[in-house]
Amino acid sequence: MADQKIRIRLKAFDHRLIDRSASEIVETAKRTGAQVRGPIPLPTKIERYTVLVSPHVDKDARDQYETRTHKRVLDIVDPNDKTVDALMKLELAAGVDVQIKLT
């Protein structure tokens, strides 16, 4: 796998969970001898929702909710076969979305 790169993109609602998963990936990749760049924090996406509390008249009574989506990017440079096998066997938390791209 000479001159290749694995880009791993992580998304989660909980920043502690995503940081823990990123550190597990970094430890696994370094243990197999690959070079890791990251984790690089990307901008947090904040979605806000405003809901009317009153069913009828009171327009002033509202509740606001938000969801924050945290993102991280990791690049694994010059991965070997051991690195790919170790990453495939890695068990990450259920609340983390993982996208892997081989370039």
From Swiss-Prot:
GO terms for biological process: translation. Belongs to the universal ribosomal protein uS10 family. GO terms for cellular component: ribonucleoprotein complex; ribosome. Involved in the binding of tRNA to the ribosomes. This is Small ribosomal subunit protein uS10. Part of the 30S ribosomal subunit. The gene is rpsJ. Gene3D superfamilies: Ribosomal protein S10 domain. Disulfide bonds: none annotated. PROSITE patterns: RIBOSOMAL_S10.
